[in-house]
């Protein structure tokens, strides 16, 4: 099988992730959790076509243009990117993206075990963003449990303390 993958993934701090995919002829910029950090620096503004939030869309950094915003559970297809958002804990959501033959899951801020519905939607992904080592995040043992449950191929830690 010949895969031509043009996806770029950037961690911007906290739980913020920028994904640039090219499922068809046009790039799609997706930003997950573009929140203003309590401390440290973050981009002043971003220009995504899609902005996804795991904890509601309040307290966001400036988003230029008119991005499609999803901050509740649901499913949609935007420019060839399939987005599935499932209810998390305490009003939060968890997100799965499928584009260019690559699947990604973002757990947001979570420190509880995953339920059956979450495991169904988020399992067997290529890339998993796991919150670990920060406030309201998994400790190492629980992060390993979540990773093993979801059987991801690549793990990217997020929400950890960084300089």
Placement of each model-derived feature along the sequence:
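Short Gly/Pro-enriched loop/turn and capping motifs at secondary-structure junctions
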Residues: 134-137, 160-163
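Proline-aspartate-enriched helix->loop->beta-strand connector
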Residues: 48, 127, 143-160
């Amino acid at each position: 099988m010949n895969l031509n993958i043009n996806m770029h993934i950037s961690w911007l701090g906290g739980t913020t992730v920028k994904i640039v995919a090219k499922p068809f002829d046009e790039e799609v910029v997706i930003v997950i959790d573009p929140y203003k950090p309590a401390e440290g620096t973050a981009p002043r503004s971003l220009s995504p076509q899609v902005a996804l939030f795991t904890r509601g869309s309040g307290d966001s950094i400036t988003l230029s243009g008119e991005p499609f915003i999803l901050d509740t559970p649901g499913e949609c297809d935007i420019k060839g990117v399939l987005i599935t958002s499932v209810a998390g804990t305490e009003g939060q959501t968890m997100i799965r993206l499928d584009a260019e033959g690559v699947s990604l899951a973002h757990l947001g801020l979570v420190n509880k075990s995953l339920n059956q519905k979450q495991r169904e939607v988020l399992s067997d992904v290529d890339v998993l963003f796991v919150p670990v080592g920060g406030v309201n995040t998994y400790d190492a043992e629980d992060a390993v449990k979540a990773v093993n449950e979801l059987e991801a191929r690549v793990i990217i830690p997020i929400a950890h303390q960084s300089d």
